[in-house]
Every structure is written in structure tokens, then in C-alpha cells.
Amino acid sequence: LDDAVIQPAGYDEAALPDIAAAAERPSAETDDRPDILLILSESLYDFSLVTDLQADAELMPVINALPNAVRGHTVSANVGGGTNVTEYEMLTSNSPMLVPTVTPFNGLDFSDANSVVGYLKSLGYTTMAAHPYAASNYNRDVVWQQLGFDETHFMQDFPTQETYGARPYQTDSATYRDWQTLYEAMPADKPRFSFLVSIQTHGDYTMNDDTQNIVHAATDYGAFDHTMDEYLSCVQMSDAAFGELCGYFTDLYARTGRKVIVAMAGDHAPSFVAHVSDPALGQGSELTFLQRSTPFVIWANYPLPHADAAQNPADPLNRMDMVMLTPTLLEQAGLPLSDYYRYLLTLKDAAPVVTGTQDYTLPDGSAAAFGEDAARDSLVRGYFDLEYNNI
């Protein structure tokens, strides 16, 4: 572990209280403890970011029109892969910048690690993690236990096993239906937190016959025409399934008054994104940044009074680093925030993305370099010091 973690230059443990004191984000804390569902959606991506995509059907009509929602883009660390890195960012709010040489769940020990799991348990939540595929993938069966999830579920607990054509992965619709059974079995007298990793849209995208595609790109992608059609079909199915899930929670609230807030984000773009990206829409790191930007949505089955706090008016794509999604979700839920989460939200206002090919970004999405603004530099470096201590 020690060899895998990079200590930031100039790190001083004694300075951490002063660094944490820079967190200025006011708390929107309430007495509510809504149920929380955090979904890592396999390969969910918006190709209109990198190509003039034209298709014969809308791809995400549900998510794009969903009322009472926050929409934007989370920026993952990698292009075309790296699910477990994104999972690590979601659960710990730690950037992979300090652990660049390892796949987190395979290379780090998470016993007693700080994460959203432990934090929500400290607030009285019961916790569950689920994935409709093999438990051994990314060592999840071990690491989820180390993180302290009260219960974990894998393929055998998703009995529907509905797939799309010849693709071997359970559909999101079936995954959500099976998950509802697991969710309803959780203790009813406590607030519930669930982390769900989907599998439907995993590559590759040449498994089905052309006749099975339900969406067809009008844009010419040459050798990637079928690949794009199958992928876009999966995206539309994911969108429809999310609508079904929201309908389930809407009915739950109407029947029982149980509040639920949901966040879903794509883990990364599909692997072929670089082959179909239009260089006219960006060059070099600018294009890479777009390839790393995956859709997210936060929605609740009850009114969200502070949704504006999660919008960045300077950036039409409302981009944020993946490490900032969970504190944004907790803020929207009205929960008390740790100093670490409050610092991340303060950082988001000044430098929304700190992980990856650029030093960091400004609120409008443009790149910033260290040395241009001392106060902002200090805020970014302070995060990495706090992260190192967090690890």
C-alpha cells in the first residue's frame, strides 16, 4: 500500500486542520434521511460530445426531460475503460492521481478505509452493494466487505437474467427489477444506502444481428456503423430502464411516503470512442476531456429544494470530477457533510475537475495551469493533501 500511494510534495500532516478550514460551502442540512441509491452505469456515454451524431430515435429522452433533476457530466479518469477506477472515485471521493499505478480494488487494502459507506453508516444508514455479474470481478467480493457494506449481492441474486439479443449481460431493466426485491428486503426502520453497478452496456458491440438493433445512426461511421448502432440501442434501453426505476420510486412515495434520492453516472465512454471522435470538435487534451465526460443525473421522488446548488452556470455541460459526485449527491439529500465532503464542494466551485491529463479546470471547463492563481493552486493542492491523509 505505501509503495502504491504517492505523497504530495510538501505534505505536512500538521497543516491539515488549516487546509480543511478552507471549506466554505454552506450546509443545506435537514433532518431528513432519505434512502440513497448510487448507480455506476456501465459505459453510459453521450456521443454528441465528440461527433455530429444523428440517429433515427432519441437516445436519452427520459433522462433529458426528467423533472426535479440535476443533469450534467462527470469526468472520469480514463477514456474507454477503467470501471474500477471510477468505482473507487465514487465510493471514496479519492482521486486516482495519488494511486496511478494500481487498479484500486486489486492493489489497495480497504479495511477500515474512509468511504461513503462508513460515513452513511455513521448517520444510521443500512448499506448494500449489488452487481449482476461475477463476484470476483475487480475483487469486489472482498473489497465491498472491507468497505463495510452490510450486505453484498452478485449474479446469483439477480435471477431474471434477461439479456438483449445475443449479448450475455443482464439488461438494466431486469437489473433494476431484481434490485427492487433486494432493496425491499433491507431493514425498513433505517434509511437505506445502496450502490449498484450495472453491466448491460459492456462491450463489445458486435454481438447482435443488425435486425436486433433498435436505434440506427444516420451519421456514417464506416467500419463502426454496426458497433455504433448496437451501442446506441443499449443506451436507449438504459434510459428507458431508468425511467421505469423512477416510476417505481414515484409509486413508492405515493404509497408509503418513503423518500429516495438517486444518482447515476456513466463509468467511462465505450472503448471505440477514439475511432469515431471528430477532431473538429476538439484537439489533444481538449478532445480527451470530452471523451472522459460521461452523463450523470440526480433525481428524487420528492422535491429537491437546492437543485440549483448543483448547477454550474459557467459550463453548459455542468462538468465535475467524478470524486465530487457523491458529496454533491449527499448535499442534495440534505445530509450533514464531513469536512472532506465540504472541502470537495468548495473545490468544485473553483476547480471542478482535478484528475487527469490537465492540471485542473476552471468553472467554465477551460484548462488552468499551476502558477496562474496562487489561491486556486493552494485549494487544489490542499485537496490532494487531504486525500493522502484520507487514504
Regions found by a protein language model. Give the residues of each.
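Intramembrane catalytic core of multi-pass membrane enzymes that act on lipidic substrates
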Residues: L1-D3, L37-L38
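Helix-hairpin-helix/helix-loop-helix acidic hairpins
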Residues: D2-D31
